[in-house]
Amino acid sequence: VNYTMDPDKIEALITDKTSAIIPVHVYGNFCDVEKIEQIAKKHNLKVIYDAAHTFGAEYKGKSAAAYGDASIYSFHATKVFNTIEGGAVAFGEPWMGHRLNCLKNFGIVDQEHVVWVGGNAKMNEFQAAMGICNLRHVDGEIEKRRHVAERYLEHLEGVKGLKLPSYDNPDWKPNYAYFPVVFDGFVAGRDLVWDYLASHKIYSRKYFYPLTNEFQCYQGRFSGEQTPVAKYVADRVLTLPMYADLAMEDVDRICGLLKEIK
């Protein structure tokens, strides 16, 4: 299980209003890009990937940018590679570059023409400089994160009621962006675990909780019953602390606290 879109559920949702499929590479796990591409070609649809979690990860020797019609990256401060705030769109068609340059600049085409409804989505020079500085450290950042993930696995593999991330897919080069743990059958529920860790000044995250349909601004748009796997994960997952400079003794302490929960 990698928490990404189930390609077998896509075709039943396609209508005459559908113009694109927007899958999410979750926690740095790649979607089933081959199946999604086949479905998109069959129905003449575009594929736009949410690649926010995947900078530095690869599938079959290629980055997420190599798949789909476009991939959208986040350079938020919490990501493996960041510019404090910002992001990027990767694409293969040159016309997309022209369109995006206009859309990120209020829809302005030239001094006299505004063709599209756009916004102000430009990165500033400071953010760009920050990105250039960070870019040289990405490989080292990922390698350090790998050691953290391996330490978590050493401690937590075999603990009843914990579903841990798996890194054994030979086609996938992970970036270790997150360390998600699903609590199902553990001695305590996810929320109690979160509270216990927080009481010891350890801050995990209930990632994707609550679900979008539970937000006030989206209520009534769709039911959680339509996305049972997302609801299952949202109600049970914690992402444990994960960053390159996380000390091994801190990982040991986090895991020790988890194991002492009764």
Locate each region found by the language model.
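Active-site phosphate-binding strand-loop segment of PLP-dependent enzymes
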Residues: 1-83, 88-90, 189
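PLP-dependent aminotransferase class I/II
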Residues: 5-8, 12, 20-24, 29, ...
